[in-house]
Amino acid sequence: MLMGIATLFIVSYIKNEHTTDLSRITIDDMQLNAKIDKDKFIEDDEILLKKHNLYTKHNQPNLVFKVNKGNSKIMGMTLIKNTDVNTNFGGKIEGNIQDVVHHLGSSYKQKKLRDAYRLMIYYDKDNHIKLSIIYKHDKIKKIEVYSK
């Protein structure tokens, strides 16, 4: 009986856990699941993945796109160092982390990392998307968004 009640509470918690809609997230006007024109990108041939290729733009080597080999759709994006790249959710390298919270809300998980770095994670359970932001002293250092 006690196990049944505990299971009910766990299932209820998981279903009621907050999720954030990340389906329209963009970095440099690029969106997950959008097709890319491979001619406008540089393929990173140093890293070999089974189902994906990694690409960068000619003028932005610090913005990396993980692209499905089969359908050329963007499955993930990682941004570091480049302070000129904008997002549509308030996140920008060296920008304030509170700008992201203002745009996306407080339904995130947070972890402490080494050397005063922190990790903020937003989940979109409906669209299977994860947004991870590493920051230090409220200044964003790295932005990653991936879908399954």
Can you annotate each of these PLM segments?
Residues 1-12:
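Hydrophobic membrane-insertion alpha-helices, especially the h-region
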Residues 12, 73-74:
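N-proximal short alpha-helices
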Residues 77, 83-87:
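Terminal, regulation- and interaction-focused segments at domain boundaries
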